[in-house]
């Protein structure tokens, strides 16, 4: 296994819609393992393939550090098939380091996809797991959590981010 580089905003791959995974082979299993190791090392609770430079519909999520009930979830070609309610949660992102903001999402979701073994699976989630799944699936659509901020907060973020990038290159 290997630690992969995490792409950060404004890397263009973060704005691309991920390609559907057509088959599960050794290369995909290695990517899953590498993404999982990268997520743990970061540390994070979720990671989408495009965050590590691969335009594939693949996510890994593990809330075990936050919630003993859930372990590692690997989802290939995940889709949200049902939603209910609304929740606001303080979110951050490995691709937008050191920035956190409250984001409105669905309180409950049902997600379908395939596991690393190729078997179809369905996950019913609420709370942090629902938020994490929606956040990672957004990545696969080329969306970042900052896109869900209200216009004023998003504008403040963009100004702060430009200043941060300018300082980093000075």
UniProtKB/Swiss-Prot annotation:
Domain of life (superkingdom): Bacteria
GO molecular function, one term: peptide deformylase activity
InterPro entries named in the record: Peptide_deformylase, Peptide_deformylase_sf
Reaction equations catalysed: N-terminal N-formyl-L-methionyl-[peptide] + H2O = N-terminal L-methionyl-[peptide] + formate
Keyword Protein biosynthesis assigned: yes
Cofactor binding description: Binds 1 Fe(2+) ion.
Cofactor requirement: Fe(2+)
Keyword annotations from UniProtKB, A to Z: Hydrolase, Iron, Metal-binding, Protein biosynthesis
Catalytic machinery residues: 136
UniProt keyword Metal-binding, yes or no: yes
Disulfide bonds listed in the record: none
Pfam families the UniProt entry points to: Pep_deformylase
GO terms under biological process: co-translational protein modification; translation
Binding site for Fe cation: 93, 135, 139
Entry EC number(s): 3.5.1.88
Cross-referenced CDD domains: Pep_deformylase (cd00487)
Family the entry assigns: Belongs to the polypeptide deformylase family.
Function of the molecule: Removes the formyl group from the N-terminal Met of newly synthesized proteins. Requires at least a dipeptide for an efficient rate of reaction. N-terminal L-methionine is a prerequisite for activity but the enzyme has broad specificity at other positions.
Record's protein name: Peptide deformylase
Organism: Syntrophobacter fumaroxidans (strain DSM 10017 / MPOB)
Lineage, uppermost ranks: Bacteria, Pseudomonadati, Thermodesulfobacteriota, Syntrophobacteria, Syntrophobacterales
